[in-house]
Amino acid sequence: MVPSTFSRLKAARCLPVVLAALIFAGCGTHTPDQSTAYMQGTAQADSAFYLQQMQQSSDDTRINWQLLAIRALVKEGKTGQAVELFNQLPQELNDSQRREKTLLAVEIKLAQKDFAGAQNLLAKITPADLEQNQQARYWQAKIDASQGRPSIDLLRALIAQEPLLGAKEKKQNIDATWQALSSMTQEQANTLVINADENILQGWLDLQRVWFDNRNDPDMMKAGIADWQKRYPNNPGAKMLPTQLVNVKAFKPASTNKIALLLPLNGQAAVFGRTIQQGFEAAKNIGTQPVAAQVAAAPAADVAEQPQPQTVDGVASPAQASVSDLTGDQPAAQPVPVSAPATSTAAVSAPANPSAELKIYDTSSQPLSQILSQVQQDGASIVVGPLLKNNVEELLKSNTPLNVLALNQPENIENRVNICYFALSPEDEARDAARHIRDQGKQAPLVLIPRSSLGDRVANAFAQEWQKLGGGTVLQQKFGSTSELRAGVNGGSGIALTGTPITPRATTDSGMTTNNPTLQTTPTDDQFTNNGGRVDAVYIVATPGEIAFIKPMIAMRNGSQSGAMLYASSRSAQGTAGPDFRLEMEGLQYSEIPMLAGGNLPLMQQALSAVNNDYSLARMYAMGVDAWSLANHFSQMRQVQGFEINGNTGSLTANPDCVINRKLSWLQYQQGQVVPVS
């Protein structure tokens, strides 16, 4: 029995030890709070993970997971779900959670494109109170709220953010800093005032001056950049040069000794192809000079209703009813300049080179693939063309290694290191109009367009550019034929300044109140109709015959004091405006290529003479002249950001995809005369 008694006593003495071990083991398996690491940015996951953790947690830990889930949902583009979860946050938060909530409110505003609301919330945050990872997000929010508009505040935000970033993000930051600097005009840059201790900003502004002074001379630019890097060795941009300036340092000019010109020389598009050829060959033989800043011209012929334009698929013309239409002969008296041109700031010319070998290839006679093979065999150094859109799309599929200045652009632009796109299209003109109208401080535009595919394309291009510039909803209204417009005038109905949204805002991503915190999920009426403001700008795409009815109909319905400024495309200007028409159009602004605005009178006379005074064909002639200039500066357009040519079809610059943008001249009817818009 002794062994049995001993065993019971031993078991009794061991029981406390076993219980203690079990208790400590239980403590060891308890999951620690991991939310802090995620809050500090040392770990990351998706919203599904955070939502799961939130459901399994309580108290402060649950709130942390909820905040993390909101941040992830915003990042994933699930703004509506983020708003719903944001509104469920409790009122009682600790200091760290309150700071995170405030920052999330800003990020949600930005996701909803409520930039003014985001800026109001940012003004209430002191960045020094934030954790380091939150500071990087704060400065990013400041950057996003600027919508890419260059300013001293944007530059300061980028500079403050840079030390907080990793290597990959630093490169993006430096490129964004340079984008802001190079997007400024010299006039904007001259107005900047900085503090004495802002050494990094001072360095960036000195680099900007180097760029302004040398952007049209790649060799001088290279030397200027190298000197700047020596003077500012500690500037982030000197240590990691912006991508665009790296391209400048690697610049090599393209050869134009042997040029292949690809144009349609037969069929419906032949008249356009041959007109471009005329302009190109004229420039090759006599050279080009920078076109003067806009001067207004006052044509003296009477306005006449224009013939219906013919349609040729895929050809680009800025004034006509499709990407390819051109009108018939429209005789007009020679315009008379009424003001002197300003001095050009981008004095880039393309010298004559009569000895350059030029070979014309007819794209209407054989498949483009065969033509490109022949061009390579012939040893061309650069291709200019093709003109038709479907041929440009075939060109992209061919993956040609040749440098190409395409005279049109495909539906979907592809960034190719050897291709630039130069088109005269109604869409291109509409984008310029959006920029011009936005620059004039207008907020609520209406696009008045023909009931056609042309109208749809123009409306979409205008709205896309308007919203890219930070504008809101754009309205559209369509009109019918000239006979319908005439009937409207006779019936006294007029045209109301109302319309339907071209690109309505998504109903799931609406505004958030700027006070503490509830988020709307349905747009208000004001948001849906240009922030509740009346239409203050009307962009009209119409022929002279159509606009002769449209402008009086607007006045008939709205009165002369409607407050809306009227703008028109060059489609309304065909060189046939008589004194009565000019008086009727009083106050209306319209766009025109610089050559036909009087910026290059000798070439205008030469072009109009060559095309029997057809203004639409004169624009194509000017396109041929500018194609020569662009071909001679192909590498600069492709590689040197900000390189600019004051061309006959506009002030020419290239975007990162080497799509040539054209800034047009803007003119205005004033007391029976045509004057530059000041």
Curated annotation (Swiss-Prot):
This is Penicillin-binding protein activator LpoA. Keywords: Cell outer membrane, Cell shape, Lipoprotein, Membrane, Palmitate, Peptidoglycan synthesis, Signal. SUPFAM superfamilies: Bacterial muramidases, Periplasmic binding protein-like I. PANTHER family: PENICILLIN-BINDING PROTEIN ACTIVATOR LPOA. HAMAP family: LpoA. Pfam families: LppC (PF04348). Residues 302-340, 496-528 are annotated as: Disordered. Belongs to the LpoA family. Residues 330-340, 513-528 have a biased composition (Low complexity). A lipid is attached at C27 (S-diacylglycerol cysteine). It is found in: Cell outer membrane. The keyword Lipoprotein applies. One of its GO terms (cellular component) is periplasmic space. A lipid is attached at C27 (N-palmitoyl cysteine). It is a lipid-anchor. Interacts with PBP1a. Residues 1-26 form the signal peptide. It comes from the Bacteria. One of its GO terms (biological process) is regulation of cell shape. Regulator of peptidoglycan synthesis that is essential for the function of penicillin-binding protein 1A (PBP1a). One of its GO terms (molecular function) is enzyme regulator activity.
